[in-house]
Every structure is written in structure tokens, then in C-alpha cells.
């Protein structure tokens, strides 16, 4: 129903001030803000493929879309875009862009005009950021405006925002899904801390210990996307190209003998590559780790702002690039923010979370694998107190969450690996726990995800999914070495590099990864970490590292070559007999159900005279033994339509 002014309340747009925030007064009516308006898909569009679809369609058999195909099937109706554009112009706002694939209308306007257009009261709010500053590595990059705070002292942040709902006129009520940019509070914190007591390894050394596959030919076809964030009010972040060159080609980094990646800078929401701020170290770390793990791959660096509009526009830009831009095959995100400030106090509005999550779902349709660091604040996600939290976007089921480990006692290919846990305000702890925003996905049902440690002990998506080295790299920044840079943001770009390598070997994109990772047939691909450590942090109750999946290291660290082999189209010998008839051939792939149990053949090419045998000619009658995995023989019984009796087929790995 419309409200008194004839406007409709936009559901899921509710904002509340952060705990302890103080409203300083109205926002400057002449300040210009960017906004993004998202619209519905064109009427009659099919539903996006869901997780069950991708679980039943294994890598190698997935059909991805072109930009034109996606726009035609799932894009916005041009009439809807024009309707919103007309509203923008009528209200004295400036129309910046419309994009049918992203389903967005981007505009800008003064605070006065925006307040009237969307029936909100924009104000200036002051809030504390009490955990970022102590965990920030104080390096040569520290040039933040204003007086520097002491360790442990609260840092005041002022932002433009509002409380309550966004409102839209009646004619847009069934067209507009969200309006973003009217609230500019912070929604991104980098996952990176100093830890000066560990002798760091290099990214190539870690890749070797994790048995990453060799660099295949044609890696120039692979593109890794990195999302980087800065303060929309005054902050900047970026990298110096000379630092990247030095890291790969000189003893300051891992050189000589390595090649610096090709880089493309893509600015979003007014941000750009502008080094000189406190977050430069994160940008340098992401580029140098991803580039070292996947030599020859191109890297897109997406610079954006750390508010809701910056998140939405950056993720949409990566998934739906402009003409001439490379679409990444892998996306790595080393930034996050707690789902909730307190229980019931949603930090991300549902509209923002839905918009970002839907775009990650769209990424699967282009074969994009998305990784996100689980954060460096243990079970607290950076929120002090007696309540556990997890961060977003790592809690999104369309994202592979990456926790942290520590590697020691290295001797050749042998090493010890434990949960990355430390104590004290200057150190870090691998993030992980149970989501408050997302239900337990079906692909985690058989992995003993514990209930939340919070009162009520609800069930939800467990994070992280996997874990990797977080115990310190030496990187190059501003022409000098910066040692001991640690955090789960080391692990996310490392695994982005691994998937780029695997894509290069396969000659096709792996795409959405989570249901595949949790398949029983892939469990030999992980190094389980069960050291009994707990990720409690900042007063929040924690979770313990135990055998199997846990909320510290997920399934464990990844054995790169084993994962490649598991994702390949396995060349399997097939031996079958029925009466006097026998034949031998190859199976290109196997079908597993959502719980990892063998269901049948994806494709089979069987040789023996002129005999052909494929998945359409038989149906599985019985499964004998467990699902196929490396070094395991599985016998299944199938029925040939031409045979009166079942045919027994034994599969053995001969790859």
C-alpha cells in the first residue's frame, strides 16, 4: 500500500544506524552522491540456474553464456530502464548510465534532490571503528588524513546515511528492486595483519608445497579479477606499477626469473588506482600473490568504494564487463564486513546482500569462480563482545570462503600445517563460523557443520570452505620490502591463481566450485587440519579445529594437482561383459548426486567392433561400493536396453 505521500516503501531497504552511532545533523544539501537503481529482469525471463543445477552439472560439462545470450535471457527490459531513467531526469538527477545486463540505472544528484526523490532524510553520522586500527600494519603506506591514533584507540568515522526505508513512486513499485548509495557507511575491511615472529615463505614456495600444477601454455587467456576498496569520502588506494615489476624481477621480491602480470585498472563509483593511502599494502599483496601463483595470467584490478554502492557496482562490473574489457575467469576478494553488528542488527541490508549474491549467482553462468577471504578476526568478524559473527561476502553460498593456516617445519615437500591462530590485538586469527544470513546449503549436509555457538544454536552456512597459508609474505611496496604481511587475504588470491592454472590445463572454465568441493569423491584433494585450536577472538566464543570440516580451516588446504586430476575428464577404462559379448572403452565423466554418491555415466565411449554405449542407452540399476575417487575401483551395475540381464561395469583410474 502507498504511504501518505503516494510513495511505496521499498521492501528490504531498511537501514538502522550502527550501534553507538551519533547523528551529527543533516547532510549538506549541496553534496553530490552517486546512486544505483536496480530493476527487475524482463517479464517472462527464466529463473537463474540454482545450486542444484550446478551440483548436477560437473565441471567439464557446463554450458556458459555469452554477454549477448545473458542479456537476451536474463537482462532488463529496455522499457523498464527508460521508465526509471525518466524518473531520474524528472527529479533533477543526472543520468550517468543504464545497463541492461547489470539491470542498473546509475545516477547522481544533490542530497536535497535525492532526499526528495526517494523520500528519505539524509544525515551525517559519526561511528567508531574500534578494531581496524589496531590490526592495521603500520608501514610506509600510512598516510591517512588527520591525527594518527594509538594502538587500541577508537577511530571516528563520519558518513552520510539515513534511517528507515527508501521510497519510490507507484509507477516504479513493480519495476525497481533496490536503490543503493544513499547510505555510505563502511562495508569493507581488508583481511591482513602483521605477524613479526614467523619467517615468511614466498608464494612460489607455498604453491610448490601445495603441489600446484605447472604453468600450462596459453595462460594469457586467463584473467584474475581483484576487488580493492577505499573510503568514499577521502581515502585512496592503489599500487605502483614499478613495485609489481620489482617483486617479480628483482631480489626485492621473488625475482629474477619470474614475469610480472599484465594489469588492467578498472575504476568504479569514482574510485581509481591512486596509491598513497593506508590500504595500498592490500592491493600490492593481492597482485603479487595472484601473479606469482598463476604466471602468465592477466589481472584486472577493480577499484571501488567501501560503501553499498561500491560493492554492487564493482561486482556487477566484474561479472558484466564493458565492451572491450576482459571478463575474469576467477574473482578474488580480500575484503569483508560482518553480516551483523549485533544479533538482529543487520549491517548489510537485505536488499544489498540480495543484489550482490544474485550477481555472484550470475557469475556462475559465465564460468567465474569466486573466492573471498574469511577475515582475520576469528569468530568475532571484528565485532567485540560475547557474540560470534561471520563476515560477508565470504558467507555467501555462491562464494568459496578461504580461511588461514600456518606452515612450519618445511623439509623438501614435507611440512607441518596448523590453524592460523594468534592472540593479542596486533595479531590475527582465521575467520570462521556459522552464518546468520544464509541457511545451511545442501552440499554441506553431510559434513557435520556444527550449530552456531550463539544462543539459540541455529543452523546455517558454515565457513570457511577451504584454508591456505596466511603466515606471512614479504612484498614490495613503494620501492622497498614490506616483510611479514599476514592474513587470510594471502590465501584467497593464491587459490584464485590455482583455479586459473586449472582452467588453463583443462582448456575451459571450472566455474562455481562449492558443490564440487564438498563431493565425497574430492575429499582426497584436501589436507585435513585438526589441531584442536580455537578461533575465539575479541571476546566472542569460538570454534575448534577438528577432524573433517571445521569452522577454522573448512575442508583443509588444497592439494593442487589432485584437484586438477579430480576436475579433469577422467579417462577411465571400462570393461563389461554380457554372455559372449565384451567391450572396452572410455568414460569421459561420471554423474554424482548432490551428496557425492555415484549415479551414472555422464558420457561413455565404448569400443568393441561397432558397439557404441553412452548414457542414453543405459540406466543405473544398482551402485556397488562407494563413489569413485582416485586409486579406488568402483563397480556399478547398469542395464543395457538390448540386454535382458544387468551388465556389470568396473571403473578404474588409468589417467
Predicted feature residues:
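Substrate-binding/charge-relay-adjacent region of secreted/lumenal peptidase catalytic domains
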Residues: 2-98, 106, 111-402, 435-487, ...
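Polar, glycine-rich mid-to-C-terminal structural blocks
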Residues: 397, 401-436
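An often Trp-containing, charged/polar helix-loop segment at the C-terminal end
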Residues: 406, 451-454, 502-551
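A recurrent domain-boundary module in secreted/ectodomain proteins
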Residues: 549-572
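Structural detector for short beta-strands of small beta-barrel domains
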Residues: 577-597
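OB-fold (S1/OB) nucleic-acid-binding surfaces
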Residues: 595-615
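Short nucleic-acid-contacting surface segments enriched for D/E, G, S/T with interspersed K/R
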Residues: 619-635
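OB-fold/S1-family single-stranded nucleic acid-binding modules
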Residues: 640-655
Amino acid at each position: 500500500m502507498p504511504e501518505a505521500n503516494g510513495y511505496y516503501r521499498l521492501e528490504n531497504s531498511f537501514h538502522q544506524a550502527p550501534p553507538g552511532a551519533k547523528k551529527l545533523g543533516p547532510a549538506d544539501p549541496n553534496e553530490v552522491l552517486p546512486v544505483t537503481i536496480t530493476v527487475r529482469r524482463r517479464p517472462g525471463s527464466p529463473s537463474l540456474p540454482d545450486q542444484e543445477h550446478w551440483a548436477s552439472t560437473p565441471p567439464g560439462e557446463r554450458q556458459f553464456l555469452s554477454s549477448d545470450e545473458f542479456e537476451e535471457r536474463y537482462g532488463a527490459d529496455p522499457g523498464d530502464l527508460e521508465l526509471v531513467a525518466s524518473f531520474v531526469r524528472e527529479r533533477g538527477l543526472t543520468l550517468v548510465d543504464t545497463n541492461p545486463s547489470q539491470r542498473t540505472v546509475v545516477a547522481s544528484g544533490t542530497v536535497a534532490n535525492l532526499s526528495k526523490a526517494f523520500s528519505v532524510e539524509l544525515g551525517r553520522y559519526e561511528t567508531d571503528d574500534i578494531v581496524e586500527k589496531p590490526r592495521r600494519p603500520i608501514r610506509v603506506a600510512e598516510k591517512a588524513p588527520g591525527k594518527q591514533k594509538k594502538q587500541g584507540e577508537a577511530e571516528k568515522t563520519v558518513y552520510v546515511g539515513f534511517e528507515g526505508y527508501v521510497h519510490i513512486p507507484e509507477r516504479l513499485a513493480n519495476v525497481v528492486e533496490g536503490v543503493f548509495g544513499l547510505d555510505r557507511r563502511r562495508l569493507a575491511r581488508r583481511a591482513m595483519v602483521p605477524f613479526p615472529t614467523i619467517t615468511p615463505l614466498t608464494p612460489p614456495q607455498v604453491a610448490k608445497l601445495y603441489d600446484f600444477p605447472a604453468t600450462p601454455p596459453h595462460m594469457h587467456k586467463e584473467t584474475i579479477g581483484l576487488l580493492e576498496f577505499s573510503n568514499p569520502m577521502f581515502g585512496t588506494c592503489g599500487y605502483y606499477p614499478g613495485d609489481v615489476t620489482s617483486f617479480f624481477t628483482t631480489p626485492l621480491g621473488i625475482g629474477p626469473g619470474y614475469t610480472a602480470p599484465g594489469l588492467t585498472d578498472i575504476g568504479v563509483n569514482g574510485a581509481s588506482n591512486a596509491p598513497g593511502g593506508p590500504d595500498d599494502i592490500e592491493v600490492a599483496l593481492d597482485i603479487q600473490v595472484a601473479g606469482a601463483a598463476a604466471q602468465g595470467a592477466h589481472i584486472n584490478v577493480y577499484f571501488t568504494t567501501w560503501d553499498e554502492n561500491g560493492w554492487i557496482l564493482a561486482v556487477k562490473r566484474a561479472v558484466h564487463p564493458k565492451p572491450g574489457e576482459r571478463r575474469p575467469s576467477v574473482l578474488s576478494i580480500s575484503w569483508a564486513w560482518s553480516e551483523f553488528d549485533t544479533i538482529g542488527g543487520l549491517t548489510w541490508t537485505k536488499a544489498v546482500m540480495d543484489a550482490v549474491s544474485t550477481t555472484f549467482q550470475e557469475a556462475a553462468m559465465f564460468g567465474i569462480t569466486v573466492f573471498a577471504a574469511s577475515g582475520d578476526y576469528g569468530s568475532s568478524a571484528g565485532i567485540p563482545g560475547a557474540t560470534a559473527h561471520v563476515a560477508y561476502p565470504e558467507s555467501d553460498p555462491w562464494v568459496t570462503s578461504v580461511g588461514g593456516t600456518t606452515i612450519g617445519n618445511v623439509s623438501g615437500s614435507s611440512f607441518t600445517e596448523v590453524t592460523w591462530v594468534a592472540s593479542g590485538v596486533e595479531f590475527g586469527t582465521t575467520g570462521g563460523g556459522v552464518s546468520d544470513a544464509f541457511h545451511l546449503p545442501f552440499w554441506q549436509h553431510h559434513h557435520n557443520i556444527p550449530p552456531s555457538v550463539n544462543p539459540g544454536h541455529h543452523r546455517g552456512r558454515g565457513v570457511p570452505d577451504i584454508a591456505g597459508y596466511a603466515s606471512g609474505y614479504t612484498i614490495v611496496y613503494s620501492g622497498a620490502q614490506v616483510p611479514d604481511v599476514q592474513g587470510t587475504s594471502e590465501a584467497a588470491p593464491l587459490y584464485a591463481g590455482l583455479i586459473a592454472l586449472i582452467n588453463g590445463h583443462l582448456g575451459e572454465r571450472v566455474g562455481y566450485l562449492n558443490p564440487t568441493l564438498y563431493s565425497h569423491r574430492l575429499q582426497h584433494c584436501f589436507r585435513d587440519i585438526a589441531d584442536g585450536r580455537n578461533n575465539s577472538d575479541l571476546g566472542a566464543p569460538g570454534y575448534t579445529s577438528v577432524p573433517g570440516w571445521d569452522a577454522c580451516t573448512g575442508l583443509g588446504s588444497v592439494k593442487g594437482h589432485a584437484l586438477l586430476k579430480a576436475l579433469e575428464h577422467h579417462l577411465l577404462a571400462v570393461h563389461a561383459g554380457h554372455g559372449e559379448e565384451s567391450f572396452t572403452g572410455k568414460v569421459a565423466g561420471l554423474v554424482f548426486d548432490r551428496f557425492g554418491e555415484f549415479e551414472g555415466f555422464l558420457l561413455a565411449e565404448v569400443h568393441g567392433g561397432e558397439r557404441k554405449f553412452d548414457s542414453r542407452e543405459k540406466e543405473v540399476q544398482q551402485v556397488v561400493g562407494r563413489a569413485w575417487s582416485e586409486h579406488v575401483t568402483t563397480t556399478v551395475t547398469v542395464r543395457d536396453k538390448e540386454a535382458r540381464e544387468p551388465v556389470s561395469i568396473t571403473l578404474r583410474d588409468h589417467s
